[in-house]
Amino acid sequence: MDYFNYQEDGQLWAEQVPLADLANQYGTPLYVYSRATLERHWHAFDKSVGDYPHLICYAVKANSNLGVLNTLARLGSGFDIVSVGELERVLAAGGDPSKVVFSGVGKTEAEMKRALQLKIKCFNVESEPELQRLNKVAGELGVKAPISLRINPDVDAKTHPYISTGLRDNKFGITFDRAAQVYRLAHSLPNLDVHGIDCHIGSQLTALAPFIDATDRLLALIDSLKAEGIHIRHLDVGGGLGVVYRDELPPQPSEYAKALLDRLERHRDLELIFEPGRAIAANAGVLVTKVEFLKHTEHKNFAIIDAAMNDLIRPALYQAWQDIIPLRPRQGEAQTYDLVGPVCETSDFLGKDRDLVLQEGDLLAVRSSGAYGFTMSSNYNTRPRVAEVMVDGNKTYLVRQREELSSLWALESVLPE
């Protein structure tokens, strides 16, 4: 459930604020987030496991705005990061580094050093060379690095190939066949402390079976490691739980948690870590855009809008479908439109074959844009990145200013005469 709904006046509201008012105040394109929705989705995970020892580590990559991170930090959230930049964002937003897990296949020595100095919860290590590097950096600092190995369980997540991460052909993690051997190596290195086991098989999963298959494989590995004297303290099941974009029927966090807890009856000493990103942020945000022109040809009707693929790349990159609805629905006969932006690429579209009643100047909302929206945006075609607003009841906060054109080349210089 989210808090973007049509009210009695016929307008689309974010909590207690008409979205049209925000468009008029802050301009378009504009990302709008709902604090109540973010909190509701986070609590859905937190409450689903009851009093079982657990930590919710929000995946910063989904939406890294400081206002979003601070909202979750106030709830007690941990964070899943993949760069030192994301780590510094968490700190700037008031996050607790002791609740941070550091994922990613290419951690640099400088990133490792900074994370160790801040005493993060755990490094999710993805290769043997990374183990050796982390052991070296930790030794130079005179500390032990807490580590978990990201295991690739070779489970087909049955999602888009670009967001599938748990197959042996993917770059992520350590293959299941070699997992025990790499754990032995980690256990033998003097500056590492083996804490956990981790996996993340993909994103936007709409069935429980892949999660459960992966978990069963990890629990079997935990048992075999214990027999060798390697004791695993936490199970990090990653993220990936899907959301409703169109007509998907993803499991609820409560269903997911129940299935996991049923399997953890024999492992009550394991802390459970979740890394949800999309499931918390996606439906907590919309992208508001304006219709600039209606272009009719013999073969197609185009609604040319002021938002483009540089603002929201998911439709172009993943062929993703996101609902696009008017802020003020009109009466009349709908026509079928492709909704396209101003960028000079044929792939610059946010929706195709949408039945809408439109006029130039109308305002539209691209739903489910709170995750992998702004964080994947760019300045392609020298377009300033858009503003972001957080709605909290009847109050609104500009949590990111729209970029000024001059800022786009402020770090550049021309050659001397």
Curated annotation (Swiss-Prot):
| Reaction(s) this enzyme catalyzes, per UniProt | meso-2,6-diaminopimelate + H(+) = L-lysine + CO2
Question: What GO terms describe the biological role, i.e. biological process, of this protein?
Answer: lysine biosynthetic process via diaminopimelate
Provide the protein name: Diaminopimelate decarboxylase
> What is the active site of this protein?
344 (proton donor)
Q: Which pathway or pathways does this protein act in?
A: Amino-acid biosynthesis; L-lysine biosynthesis via DAP pathway; L-lysine from DL-2,6-diaminopimelate: step 1/1
- The answer on whether this UniProt entry bears the keyword Lyase reads yes
Positions binding substrate in this chain are 278, 314, 318, 345, 372
As for what it does, the entry says: Specifically catalyzes the decarboxylation of meso-diaminopimelate (meso-DAP) to L-lysine.
Which family does the entry's similarity section mention? Belongs to the Orn/Lys/Arg decarboxylase class-II family. LysA subfamily.
| Cofactor(s) this protein cannot do without | pyridoxal 5'-phosphate
- The EC number(s) attached to this protein equal 4.1.1.20
Q: Which gene encodes it?
A: lysA
> Can you name the source organism?
Vibrio cholerae serotype O1 (strain ATCC 39315 / El Tor Inaba N16961)
GO molecular function term, any single one: pyridoxal phosphate binding
Pfam families found in the cross-reference section: Orn_Arg_deC_N (PF02784), Orn_DAP_Arg_deC (PF00278)
